[in-house]
C-alpha cells in the first residue's frame, strides 16, 4: 500500500456510494502517516465540489483519518474554540493521487463546549434509498456513530485535549 510521507502535499477526495466524486480538498500537508492513521493539516485550501463550484476553507484545520473506523474528523481552529466536523464514511484508501473515502452523508458536529449533534439524517435516508445502501453498511455506520460518540465523550483521539496543540504546531512547522 502506498503511504504519503510526512510533509508531503496530498489531495483529499470524497466519493458517494455510487462511485461519483463528491468533493476534493486540493492541498493538505501530511503530518503523520502510518498504515492505520493519516493526520493532515490545511488552511485556506481550495475545495472543489462535484458540480464544479469552488470555495476556500476559512480557517486552519487538522484532519484525522483511520483505516479501522468508518469516520474521519476535521478539527477547525477558530477564534472562539475548536469545532470538530465528523464525516461518517469508509476507512481511508490512499494512492499517489489522493487520500480517498466514501462519504455516507451522516455527520456529527462537535462544539467547543463539548456538545455534539448528529446531522443530515434525512439526506442519509434519501441517499440510502436512491443508491441502495445495503443493510450491512447501515449497521456499520450506526455502530460507528456510537463509537464516535464515545470517543467524543471520552475525549479520545482527535478529541483529546492535547491533540490540536500537538498537530497544529507540527502543521505550522511543515507548511
From Swiss-Prot:
Source species of the chain: Listeria monocytogenes serovar 1/2a (strain ATCC BAA-679 / EGD-e)
Keyword Transferase found: no
Binding site for Mg(2+) 2: 105, 107, 120, 123
The EC number(s) this enzyme carries: 3.6.1.15, 3.6.1.6
Pfam families cross-referenced by the UniProt entry: DUF402
Keywords of this entry: Hydrolase, Magnesium, Metal-binding
Family under the similarity heading: Belongs to the Ntdp family.
GO molecular function: magnesium ion binding; nucleoside diphosphate phosphatase activity; ribonucleoside triphosphate phosphatase activity
Protein name: Nucleoside triphosphate/diphosphate phosphatase
Positions that bind Mg(2+) 1: 87, 103, 107
Role according to the record: Has nucleoside phosphatase activity towards nucleoside triphosphates and nucleoside diphosphates.
SUPFAM superfamilies: FomD-like
Amino acid at each position: 500500500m502506498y503511504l504519503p510521507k510526512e510533509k508531503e502535499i496530498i489531495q483529499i477526495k470524497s466519493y458517494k456510494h455510487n462511485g461519483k466524486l463528491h468533493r476534493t480538498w486540493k492541498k493538505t500537508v501530511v503530518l503523520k502517516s502510518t498504515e492505520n492513521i493519516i493526520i493532515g493539516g490545511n488552511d485556506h485550501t481550495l475545495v472543489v465540489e462535484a458540480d464544479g463550484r469552488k470555495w476556500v476553507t476559512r480557517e486552519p484545520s487538522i484532519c484525522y483519518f483511520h483505516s479501522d473506523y468508518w469516520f474521519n474528523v476535521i478539527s477547525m481552529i477558530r477564534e472562539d474554540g475548536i469545532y470538530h466536523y465528523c464525516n461518517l464514511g469508509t476507512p481511508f484508501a490512499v494512492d499517489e493521487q489522493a487520500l480517498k473515502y466514501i462519504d455516507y452523508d451522516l455527520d456529527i458536529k462537535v462544539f467547543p463546549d463539548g456538545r455534539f449533534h448528529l446531522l443530515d439524517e434525512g439526506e442519509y435516508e434519501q441517499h440510502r434509498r436512491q443508491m441502495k445502501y445495503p443493510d450491512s453498511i447501515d449497521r456499520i455506520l450506526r455502530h460507528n456513530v456510537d463509537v464516535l460518540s464515545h470517543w467524543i465523550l471520552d475525549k479520545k483521539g482527535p478529541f483529546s485535549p492535547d491533540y490540536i496543540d500537538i498537530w497544529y504546531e507540527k502543521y505550522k512547522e511543515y507548511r
